[in-house]
UniProtKB/Swiss-Prot annotation:
Compartmental location: Cell membrane
E.C. number: 3.1.-.-
Record protein name field: Ribonuclease Y
Domain KH: 209-269
UniProt keyword DNA damage present: no
Chain's gene name: rny
Length: 519
């Protein structure tokens, strides 16, 4: 029983598997058939769509072909019509040329006829002229016989009489025209100068050769002098400026003709007073610091001046030299202010005459630039200024304005003439300059230059208003014996070459320093 059940179950399973396989196969075959049918439908549909697209493209191609054909035919028709028009114009031109040719032929015939007539008339004129010349000669001979003069003598006499009659009239006319021209030129020049001067409002204060440093109290005077005068001697030696400490309450006077040195000394002394530490080593540091500060001030003054007159693209070194003019005076007149004033005047005159205002300003600012270093370099301030302008690539017009503003060379441009006129205007106005101060400063500069010309001299300072020249020498080159000889030589040369009131004390300073650093 159990075996039969197992067999039946096994048979049922086998039949179930076989039946399932048959059913699954039938389903698979049915799906494959459906898939083939679907694929065939898709292919058929694709063929139909392809046929439709092909037909559409063929239609579009035919339409485009038709459009191109129509356009080509239209262009051909247009070209044919254009060719016909050109052919018509050419035919018309040919006809015109033929007509003109006929006209020219006719004119040639007429001209030939006229030329023949002119030749006939010319022959008649020549015959008449010959007869006239014969008559004239007869008349001249008759006149010479009657007057007793030849033809040339008669002509010369007549010309001389006419010349005498006209010479006086011509002289009067020329004189009147010259007078009118001079009056017109003078009037125009006065109007130009008056206009320029009225447009410029410049103030001026005469430069001084002293500076005053205020002190917090009179005890500070003793600290400035130092033990046995060491501090004041160090400061005077380093700066070349006299320190005058007198009864003036809470003030020290700095005296010196070189404004740059005086400003360095003033700045150093102000810093020392503020710091409170005053001894030779500190003085040296402060003097060096003051030199740098004054250099910055000089550079800023140059930049401000160039900006004020619109002188752009100037070399930085030349700008700094322009700034040095702020510490230079000419007959008591500040040279930088004078240069700016000349620049403005030259610009105004140039504007009235239609010249380049910017170039006139630049030339006016630089016309006295040589004065900034004329006490350091040999030569006149004009020669030095020309060399500086060439060195720093200035315009030829600017160089000529510098060279010609004192008449050393001929001006080559209107700008140069205007700068010279502006320079004269600035210098000649009342109160602008003082002759005495300039002569005094030149005497001190000459005193220093003379002393520095000797070998072994490092620096020379004119102090005590020119009554003393202090000469700093190199201890390696000048010994104690040579220092006495040097003082005597300088004294002799001063007596031979300079004119001065009173006496001048010559002091030769020879200092040897031994410095070591403890580590």
């Amino acid at each position: 029983m159990n075996l039969l059940s197992l067999l039946l179950i096994l048979l049922g399973i086998i039949l179930g598997v076989v039946g399932g396989y048959v059913v699954a196969r039938n389903l698979l075959l049915q799906k494959q058939s459906q898939a083939r049918q679907t694929a065939e439908d898709i292919v058929n549909q694709a063929h139909k769509e392809a046929d439709n697209i092909k037909k559409e493209k063929l239609l579009e191609a035919k339409e485009e072909n038709q459009i191109l054909r129509e356009q080509t035919e239209a262009e051909l028709r247009e070209r044919r019509s254009e060719l016909q028009r050109q052919e018509t114009r050419l035919l018309q031109k040919e006809e015109n040329l033929e007509r003109k040719s006929d006209l020219l032929d006719k004119k040639d015939e007429i001209l030939e006829q006229k030329e023949s007539k002119i030749e006939e008339k010319q022959q008649q004129v020549d015959a008449k002229e010959s007869s006239v010349q014969t008559l004239i000669m007869k008349h001249e001979q008759e006149l010479e016989r009657i007057s007793g003069l030849t033809q040339e003598e008669a002509i010369n006499e007549q010309l001389q009489r006419v010349e005498e009659e006209l010479s006086q009239d011509i002289a009067v006319l020329v004189k009147e025209k010259e007078k009118e021209a001079k009056e017109k030129v003078d009037k125009t020049a006065k109007e130009l100068l008056a206009t320029a001067v009225q447009r410029l409002a410049a103030d001026h204060t005469s430069e001084s050769t002293v500076s005053v440093v205020n002190l917090p109290n009179d005890e500070m005077k003793g600290r400035i002098i130092g033990r046995e005068g060491r501090n004041i001697r160090t400061l005077e030696t380093l700066t070349g400026i006299d320190l005058i400490i007198d009864d003036t309450p809470e003030a020290v006077i700095l005296s010196g003709f070189d404004p740059i040195r005086r400003e360095i000394a003033r700045t150093a002394l102000v810093n020392l007073v503020s710091d409170g530490r005053i001894h030779p080593g500190r003085i040296e540091d402060m003097v060096e610091k003051a030199r740098k500060e004054v250099d910055d001030i000089i550079r800023e003054a140059g930049e401000q001046a160039t900006f004020e007159v619109n002188a752009h693209n100037m070399h930085p070194d030349l700008v700094k030299i322009v700034g040095r003019l702020n510490y230079r005076t000419s007959y008591g007149q500040n040279v930088l202010k004078h240069s700016i004033e000349v620049a403005h005047l030259a610009s105004m005159l140039a504007a009235e005459l239609g010249e380049d205002e910017t170039l006139a300003k630049r030339a006016g600012l630089l016309h006295d630039v040589g004065k900034a270093i004329d006490h350091e370099v040999e030569g006149s301030h004009v020669e030095i200024g020309v060399e500086l302008a060439k060195k720093y690539g200035e315009n030829e017009t600017v160089i000529n304005a510098i060279h010609s503003h004192h008449g050393d060379v001929e001006p080559t441009s209107i700008i140069s003439i205007l700068v010279a006129a502006a320079d004269a205007l600035s210098a000649a106005r009342p109160g602008a300059r003082k002759e005495t101060l300039e002569n005094y400063i030149r005497r001190l500069e000459r005193l220093e230059t003379l002393s520095e010309s000797y070998d072994g001299v490092e620096k020379a300072f004119a102090i005590q208003a020119g009554r003393e020249i202090r000469v700093i020498v190199s201890p390696e080159e000048i010994d104690d014996l040579k220092s006495y000889r040097l003082a005597r030589d300088i004294k002799n040369q001063i007596e031979d070459e300079l004119q001065y009131p009173g006496h001048i004390k010559v002091t030769v300073v020879r200092e040897t320093r031994a410095v070591e650093y403890a580590k």
